[in-house]
Amino acid sequence: LGALGCVFPELLSGNGVKFGYA
């Protein structure tokens, strides 16, 4: 994902989706 892996988690995190990109 690269850059998207940093943007999507932020957008989806507010949507109730958890990501492990921390």
From Swiss-Prot:
Plastid listed as a keyword: yes
UniProt keyword list: Chlorophyll, Chloroplast, Chromophore, Magnesium, Membrane, Metal-binding, Phosphoprotein, Photosynthesis, Photosystem I, Photosystem II, Plastid, Thylakoid
GO terms of biological process kind = photosynthesis
Location (main, coarse): plastid
Q: How is it modified after translation?
A: Photoregulated by reversible phosphorylation of its threonine residues.
The record's Gene Ontology cellular component field reads: chloroplast thylakoid membrane; photosystem I; photosystem II
Entry's family note: Belongs to the light-harvesting chlorophyll a/b-binding (LHC) protein family.
Q: What does this protein do?
A: The light-harvesting complex (LHC) functions as a light receptor, it captures and delivers excitation energy to photosystems with which it is closely associated.
Protein name as it appears in the record: Chlorophyll a-b binding protein 3c, chloroplastic
Q: Recall the taxonomic lineage recorded for the source organism.
A: Eukaryota, Viridiplantae, Streptophyta, Embryophyta, Tracheophyta
